[in-house]
Amino acid sequence: MSSSPRSPDARPLKVRVKSARTRSSSSQKWLQRQLNDPYVARAKREGWRSRAAFKLIEMDEKLHVLKRGMRIVDLGAAPGGWSQVAAKKIGAAEGQGKIVAIDLLEMDAVTGVMFAQMDFLDPTAPERLFAMLDGKADLVMSDMAANTTGHKKTDHLKIIALVELAADFARQVLAPGGAFIAKVFQGGTEGTLLADLKRDYAQVRHLKPAASRADSAELYLVATGFRGSADRTEDETDEA
């Protein structure tokens, strides 16, 4: 695994996409951006399924979240870039640790990774997960993003709502001392979410990896040192 997301190979000559009658302006811009993105090219060369792999690589280089033998849940895993990185880091192919990738969409198999095509909000999801992991998880990670509308405030609220659901799922399935990683967008309404995470975890940090596009408002929350769901229940009882 290459370990320097900040120094992709020199950018190739810029590719211009010829317009097509059946292609919308937005899809044409997306295609041109993909063709000229050094991380997209590098992901193809190195065998990663998506450029998002480099985001997790960089976060782990800074915070050392991924450790051999961990039990990991990858929410919204398709196409599998994060699962690939995690599997390599924890030694899943050699029988070290376990990873369960969860998505509503189908996903091609990743060596050392178990896949569950289901909704993580299904009430049976935690128990199914415990059976697959043989216990609680050490890390829940989510690179999920809600479908966007183009309205920044609305889109931000949608992604925060999705992160809150993922954080609630993490509370149910994490072992004490566990960690939670999730994508968010800058927007100024994360106060309640951050307060909850700071209550649930010993440390909460924000990161914007180099592989995140410069014009993107995305950030990643990395929460470590899960205090345990029992601790939160006691706190809520005291506040009542």
Swiss-Prot record:
UniProt cross-references to Pfam families, sorted A to Z: FtsJ
InterPro entries: RNA_methyltr_RlmE, RNA_MeTrfase_FtsJ_dom, rRNA-MeTfrase_E, SAM-dependent_MTases_sf
GO molecular function annotations of the record: rRNA (uridine-2'-O-)-methyltransferase activity
Keywords: Cytoplasm, Methyltransferase, rRNA processing, S-adenosyl-L-methionine, Transferase
Location(s) in or outside the cell: Cytoplasm
EC number, as in UniProt: 2.1.1.166
Catalytic activity: uridine(2552) in 23S rRNA + S-adenosyl-L-methionine = 2'-O-methyluridine(2552) in 23S rRNA + S-adenosyl-L-homocysteine + H(+)
Active site: 183 (proton acceptor)
Any one of the GO CC terms: cytoplasm
Protein residues bound to S-adenosyl-L-methionine: 80, 82, 103, 119, 143
Transferase found in the keyword field: yes
Region (Disordered): 1-28
Broad class of the protein's primary localization: cytoplasm
Known function: Specifically methylates the uridine in position 2552 of 23S rRNA at the 2'-O position of the ribose in the fully assembled 50S ribosomal subunit.
Protein family (similarity comment): Belongs to the class I-like SAM-binding methyltransferase superfamily. RNA methyltransferase RlmE family.
Designated name of the protein: Ribosomal RNA large subunit methyltransferase E
Species this chain originates from: Azorhizobium caulinodans (strain ATCC 43989 / DSM 5975 / JCM 20966 / LMG 6465 / NBRC 14845 / NCIMB 13405 / ORS 571)
Gene (name only): rlmE
